[in-house]
A protein has these predicted regions:
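Short catalytic-loop micro-motif centered on adjacent basic/acidic residues
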Residues: 41, 63, 95
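Active-site cofactor/cluster-binding pocket
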Residues: 45-61, 65-81, 85-87
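Mixed-charge interfacial surface used for oligomerization/domain docking
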Residues: 1-16, 69-73, 77-82, 91-94, ...
Length: 170
């Protein structure tokens, strides 16, 4: 049995909460972020939410989370796994720290599917995918420096100078 499920983050722009699910409107979100003087924030899914997702009929369950450097999702997924394992100690669940975001997570999911379709054991899939993650590098390009300035990762002066010189971080 295949059990694919996306567990969304909750994004906050000002006082508004936006769920990052299939209804997410990226253009609308970007407009709201640009219009808001505060930096957007996010909340990771709860351990209970992960636990519910793990409660499926699949023999092998793999969770791929945002980088633990960017989000608490990895820790929540681990806690959710521990909770479900209390009642289902025979479940095979592995949580992958993607060390990435966006397309990096998708590529990891595709690698898991490729390994499963090749008939690898649970342990072989985990080992192969962990090795794959170690070799993966994801780069981001920012359109502007506003969010870095808003969240304090870049001073107002540095953001102003970099924007005036049309410098973007890489």
């Amino acid at each position: 049995d295949e059990c694919f499920e996306s567990i969304p983050l909750t994004l906050m722009v000002g006082a508004e909460q936006i769920i990052d699910d299939e209804t997410f409107d990226q253009a609308d979100f970007i407009d709201k972020v640009a219009a808001c003087p505060e930096c957007p924030k996010s909340a990771c899914p709860s351990p209970e939410r992960y636990m519910r997702a793990y409660d499926c009929e699949a023999e092998h369950i793999y969770a791929v989370t945002l980088s633990s450097e960017l989000s608490g999702s990895y820790n929540s997924a681990l806690l959710g796994r521990d909770l479900i394992m209390e009642d289902h100690p025979d479940k095979k669940i592995h949580v992958f720290n993607s060390r990435s975001a966006s397309i990096g997570e998708s590529l990891i999911g595709m690698k898991i599917q490729e390994c499963e379709e090749a008939g690898m054991s649970f342990e072989e899939v985990v080992s192969t995918v962990e090795h794959y993650i170690e070799g993966q590098h994801t780069f981001f390009v920012l359109e502007n420096l506003d969010t870095l300035r808003k969240n304090g990762r870049l001073s107002k002066v540095k953001a102003l100078v970099a924007s005036a010189l049309k410098i973007k971080p890489d």
